[in-house]
A protein has these predicted regions:
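Hydrophobic structural segments
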Residues: 1-130
Length: 131
């Protein structure tokens, strides 16, 4: 895991941090919000392993002082998902994984996932915070 306010290079996985000023709603006395950017290899179709990895990264980021952790596009399912998006069981598996992630406290998580409804499948992001 690296803590680097100016890094944008990919590594073997971990969390990079950046700070931004916030007018309101900051969780700390400085008025800053610290963002963690998760970089890791998420396995295509392995929602359980990806969920476990995301939990570990979120907890690690929180312990290093992050207020928000941002995961990559479709991190929950892995990229590129290809024909996995056509499976009827996908929606239920994704909802279960998001529910499992939502119980992590004291950090906001932005999680890329495929949202399925009667209009189709959409590349989406969930914002999870304290359940």
């Amino acid at each position: 895991m690296s803590k680097d306010n100016n890094s944008n290079s990919a590594d073997k996985g971990g969390v990079n941090h950046a700070q931004a000023n916030a007018d309101t709603g900051a969780n700390n006395a400085t008025g800053n919000v610290t963002f963690a950017l998760a970089q890791s290899h998420f396995l295509v179709g392995d929602i359980n392993t990806n969920t476990d990895k995301m939990r570990k990264l979120a907890i690690e980021a929180r312990e290093q002082g992050a207020d928000v952790i941002i995961f990559p596009e479709l991190a929950l399912l892995g990229y590129p998902p290809q024909d996995l998006l056509l499976r009827p069981s996908l929606s239920g598996r994704v909802k279960s994984a998001l529910s499992a992630l939502s119980d992590i406290e004291n950090i906001v998580m932005i999680v890329g996932y495929p949202h399925v409804d009667h209009h189709g499948t959409f590349n989406s992001a969930a914002i999870l915070h304290n359940g």
